[in-house]
Every structure is written in structure tokens, then in C-alpha cells.
């Protein structure tokens, strides 16, 4: 999906690059890479049964804003970011792509996470040429992420839009229970 996003960006005349953990960014080429920018994006991976437009809606929203700015000549240094391993149903740990580049997650937190094929995240990153110790992302003025609702709160209240400033950080645990199932 990241390659397809890059190809779409090229069709539209946008530049693209991947950071040290494989997150993909599209940008308007008229702006210096050193100039502060707004980052709009989300992720392209999803959890099983996560919803058809789970993270993709945020990527499309960023592309629409960037296209509007380009078409109307609006002075808006914007990048669209597609983070990797945000849901990470493969490694049992979420927000890896964004966490590593913001220094909210460190190598020792995730490097030994194992996927369904028995590979550690460290091994996968080594094979792909990514780093578990990337530089901290720089230059972001603000970050905006459009996302699907993951519950029914808006629907129950009859609201079309909800705005949040933080989310609950998910934690997963593996638990082994020893004993007998003798009561429901």
C-alpha cells in the first residue's frame, strides 16, 4: 500500500520519501524540506475486522487538502504521512511507526516483539533496512488525523463529527492461566 501511495503521489506531482522506520510521506515540492509543515495522515494497516476505511480515511483527507491547496494556490506547507505498524496486529503492539519517530516508544520496548512468522521486529527492520533508533521527527507545526469512529458514540448522539485531542493508548498482555476450567 505504501508503494501505491507513492505512485499516486507521483501522478499528482508530489514528492515522496520514507523515514528511518519506513513511514511514507508525500509533500508539495514547492516547499523546502527544512520548512516547518503541517502533517496530515494516519496509517495504512488495520486490525482484523477494523473497518474498511480504518486508517485510509486519514490519508485520503490529507491528499484532498494537499490537492485543494495545490489547485487553489494556497500557501500551505503540508505533508501527508502514512505510518507503519500503527495497528500492528502482526506484532501485537500498536503505534510503532509514530511512536519510534516521536520517541514515545524505544527499541527496547518493541525490538523483541514477535510476528506470526516467528520473526522479531528487530529482524524485520534489519531485513528492510529500517532503524529501531531513528532520529526524532522535526518541523511539524501540528498533526491532524481524520479517522473513522471506532464505536457508536456519534451515531447514538446523532452527531456527524467528533473532535478529540488525545486517545487512550492500547496495551496488550499475554496471559497464561494454569488450572482447570471447572466453573463458568
Residue positions per predicted region:
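Midchain, well-structured core segments that form catalytic/ion-binding scaffolds
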Residues: 85-184
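Acidic/His- and Gly-rich active-site-bordering loop/insert found
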Residues: 1-51, 69
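Alpha-helical metal-binding/catalytic segments enriched in His/Glu/Asp
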Residues: 40-43, 49-89, 173-177
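Short coil/turn connectors at secondary-structure junctions
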Residues: 12, 33-38, 72-78, 138-142, ...
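Flexible, glycine/charged-enriched surface loops at secondary-structure junctions
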Residues: 19, 77, 132-136
Amino acid at each position: 500500500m505504501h508503494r501505491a501511495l507513492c505512485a499516486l503521489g507521483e501522478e499528482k506531482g508530489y514528492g515522496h520519501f520514507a523515514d528511518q522506520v519506513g513511514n511514507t510521506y508525500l509533500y508539495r515540492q514547492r516547499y523546502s524540506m527544512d520548512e516547518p509543515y503541517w502533517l496530515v495522515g494516519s496509517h495504512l494497516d488495520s486490525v482484523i475486522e477494523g473497518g474498511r476505511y480504518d486508517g485510509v480515511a486519514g490519508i485520503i483527507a490529507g491528499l484532498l487538502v494537499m490537492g485543494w491547496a495545490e489547485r487553489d494556490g494556497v500557501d500551505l506547507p503540508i505533508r501527508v504521512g502514512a505510518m507503519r505498524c500503527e495497528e500492528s496486529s502482526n506484532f501485537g503492539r500498536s503505534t510503532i511507526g509514530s511512536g519510534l519517530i516521536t520517541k514515545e516508544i524505544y527499541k527496547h520496548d518493541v525490538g523483541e516483539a514477535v510476528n506470526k512468522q516467528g520473526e522479531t521486529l528487530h529482524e524485520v527492520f534489519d531485513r528492510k533496512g529500517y532503524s529501531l533508533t531513528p532520529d526524532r521527527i522535526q518541523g511539524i507545526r501540528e498533526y491532524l488525523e481524520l479517522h473513522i469512529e471506532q464505536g457508536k458514540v456519534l451515531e447514538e448522539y446523532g452527531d456527524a463529527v467528533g473532535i478529540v485531542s488525545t486517545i487512550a493508548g492500547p496495551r496488550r498482555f499475554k496471559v497464561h492461566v494454569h488450572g482447570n476450567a471447572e466453573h463458568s
